[in-house]
Amino acid sequence: DRDWSSDVCSSDLQNGLISHGHDELDRYTLNSKIGAELASWARLDYSTKWTRKDYEKPQYLTGLFFHNIARRWPSCPVVDPNGNWMAEMEIYELEDGGIYKENNDEFTQQLKFTFTPLKGWNIYAEGALRLTNNKTTQNKIPIYNYNVANEPMLRDSGYGTVTYVYDNRYKQNYYAVNVYTDYSHSFGKHNGKVLLGLNYERYNQDNMWASGTDLTTEDKPFLSQTQSNKKNGDGYWNRATAGYFGRFNYNYMSKYLLEMNLRYDGSSKFRPENR
């Protein structure tokens, strides 16, 4: 006996929240599930999911921008007599100040076995794996204001007056294992159930970043086009948790109830002698 399902989704979640500049969020998913009765006492369930998220916005569209616009008055002019955007409206920053982009891929797989060797006795073994790949790029382009003579003046909007590029990539692996068993039995007016199991989770992540300033041309805001202040670095971290648990349930005539729980957990967050 088998059952399966699959679906594909593509959604343009947010095609812009601002009138100046461009911001957009796109999301794509692909899901599949399959289940099979391997035997009268064994079942297999498997699922896979892929998710892609693409996000783009002006690099100036941060908390500082929203903080500033909350202090503007409805009477503030939008353009000057020469037809240029007024500096206080921060429109040039949104339109010409650079772009922030983020691309995120997640691939998840889950596998579960269910065994029933005896009536009332179940054994479960579950495993999950999630792979995440993320790429973030940001470029900052200086902008200009114009004086009364319509002459351009370089403006520092809080991020300097030189071109800047930042690139960050990271990969994260997540693993989870759950193995547990339960047994329930009734005799007369007595009903009981016992549950025992263990849980293990682990994260591994590494990243690499680089930055630079002074682009050869603002039309190609890439790291390879920066000429000064070139920097790079990387990082790695991991953490893990493990737990053991048990539960005993008893009731008499479905009226008098008793439940006992036991759990022991450990985490790599703490020093070895205190985990």
What is each stretch, according to the model?
Residues 1-4, 8:
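Single conserved hydrophobic/aromatic residue that forms the stacking wall/gate
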Residues 9-13, 258-270:
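Transmembrane beta-strand segments that form the barrel wall of outer-membrane beta-barrel proteins
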Residues 17-23, 29, 33-108, 124-242, ...:
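Surface-exposed loop/interface segments of Gram-negative outer-membrane beta-barrel transport/assembly proteins
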Residues 32, 36-37, 113-117, 183-185, ...:
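Residue-level signature of outer-membrane beta-barrel architecture
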Residues 120:
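Active-site and adjacent substrate-binding regions of carbohydrate-active enzymes
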Residues 242-252:
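Structured alpha-helical segments in the cores of large, soluble enzyme domains
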Residues 272-275:
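Short glycine/threonine-rich loop-to-helix capping motif typified by GTGT followed
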